[in-house]
Amino acid sequence: MKVASGSTATAAAGPSCALKAGKTASGAGEVVRCLSEQSVAISRCAGGAGARLPALLDEQQVNVLLYDMNGCYSRLKELVPTLPQNRKVSKVEILQHVIDYIRDLQLELNSESEVGTPGGRGLPVRAPLSTLNGEISALTAEAACVPADDRILCR
């Protein structure tokens, strides 16, 4: 997906399209884009199956919109774990999996809120990091007593 720098993209897209900096799991900044003015213009375009795009959109602008949409579908394929990775999937199938995944997440959230805490459903309660760090340091101290040849078995 094409990503422009923050200052030029805001100026080019106009005041109605804001850029928001988000954080990915790896910590790298990623630009999250809102709908561009062109896509808003397309969505407002009234008409049925024979409707034409507004005159303000030339072929290059339409190609840019399609490229951005393909990038969005690629991102969805990465984010949704239920999509099959070993074969090519259609855009409709991607959307169906996204909808199902969101529904599953909502059901999971609702079931947690009804029961209370995750530990109340039979799931183990997570230990605090201080407890885990203490256990790790105790294991490290014990490992110092073990001969170096036997330590490899503990990994």
From Swiss-Prot:
It is found in: Cytoplasm; Nucleus. The keyword GTP-binding does not apply. Signal peptide: none annotated. GO terms for biological process: angiogenesis; blood vessel endothelial cell migration; blood vessel morphogenesis; BMP signaling pathway; circadian rhythm; collagen metabolic process; endothelial cell apoptotic process; endothelial cell morphogenesis. One of its GO terms (cellular component) is nucleus. Residues 53-105 form the bHLH domain. It comes from the Eukaryota. Keywords: Biological rhythms, Cytoplasm, Developmental protein, Nucleus, Repressor, Transcription, Transcription regulation. A motif (Nuclear export signal) lies at residues 98-111. One of its GO terms (molecular function) is protein dimerization activity. Transcriptional regulator (lacking a basic DNA binding domain) which negatively regulates the basic helix-loop-helix (bHLH) transcription factors by forming heterodimers and inhibiting their DNA binding and transcriptional activity. Implicated in regulating a variety of cellular processes, including cellular growth, senescence, differentiation, apoptosis, angiogenesis, and neoplastic transformation. Inhibits skeletal muscle and cardiac myocyte differentiation. Regulates the circadian clock by repressing the transcriptional activator activity of the CLOCK-BMAL1 heterodimer. This is DNA-binding protein inhibitor ID-1.
